[in-house]
Amino acid sequence: MDELLSIVQKAVDEKKGERPLLYDFRELNPFIDHVVICSAPRVRQTHAIADNIKDRVRENGYEIRAMEGNSESRWVLVDLNSIVVHVFMNEERDHFQLEKLYADLPHEDFSL
């Protein structure tokens, strides 16, 4: 696993992200290598996870391309160029079902 993925994995784990999954997009998309999906039971925790990813990534010298979502968003997207992280509230994750959309892609549990 590359360094940036390890940083993201640890950042999600530190804030108790639930059901983390890692999808391999390298065969499908020339712009991103991986997509990470995780969730949390509350909006506050959702944002804590996203903020921790942002902080840990920057601490290690990597750039954040973009973060989408405001303080009340139930879905926050963190774009790290080669990795895109979706942090959902549990209900939003169940509603949008990205796992079904990505079902044919190689994926694995991203828990520590």
Task: Locate each region found by the language model.
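Polybasic/polar functional segments that serve as interface/processing modules
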Residues: M1-F31, P41-V76, N90-D94, L98-L112
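Short, aliphatic-rich beta-strand segments
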Residues: D33-V35
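Short hydrophobic/aromatic beta-strand micro-patches
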Residues: I37-S39
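Active-site beta-strand termini and strand-to-loop segments that position acidic
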Residues: V78-N81
